[in-house]
């Protein structure tokens, strides 16, 4: 299921930014910028590899799933894109061989540069 960026932005009007994702037993607690737990997700969704203020990335088997701040999955990418190395603000960086690819939070590649 694809969500257009416009619909995505409209749907998160009342959403608060992610402050922290806290692992607890077999769960992940999503904590907003006011310090309140907004959602609890099972760790069965996979391993959280990083998060920004409005999204987080989960590695599940050979897939990367993108979730919004309310805990809804909105995009799945193959691990063939590379290894997620960092998540900052509204973007994330993936290392693919000798290249670093930058993606926006919607999973669209926006830049490629040499990893040196």
Model-predicted segments: where are they?
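Charged, amphipathic alpha-helical segments
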Residues: 2-17, 41, 45, 49
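Surface-exposed loop/turn elements that mediate protein-protein interactions on large endomembrane-trafficking
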Residues: 3, 25-43, 64-79, 102-114
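Short beta-strand elements that form the blades of beta-propeller/WD-repeat-like
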Residues: 8-10, 14-23, 52-59, 85-96, ...
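Residue-identity detector for glycine
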Residues: 12, 35, 46, 50-52, ...
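Residue-level detector of conserved, function-critical positions
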Residues: 41-51, 55-57, 76-87, 93, ...
């Amino acid at each position: 299921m694809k969500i257009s960026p416009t619909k995505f932005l409209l749907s998160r009007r009342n959403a608060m930014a992610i402050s922290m994702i806290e692992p607890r037993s077999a769960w992940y607690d999503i904590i907003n910028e006011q310090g309140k737990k907004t959602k609890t997700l099972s760790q069965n969704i996979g391993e959280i590899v990083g998060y920004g203020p409005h999204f987080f990335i989960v590695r599940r088997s050979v897939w990367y799933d993108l979730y919004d701040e309310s805990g809804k999955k909105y995009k799945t990418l193959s691990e063939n894109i590379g290894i997620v190395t960092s998540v900052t603000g509204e973007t994330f960086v993936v290392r693919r061989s000798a290249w670093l690819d930058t993606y926006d939070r919607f999973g669209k590649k926006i830049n490629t540069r040499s990893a040196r």
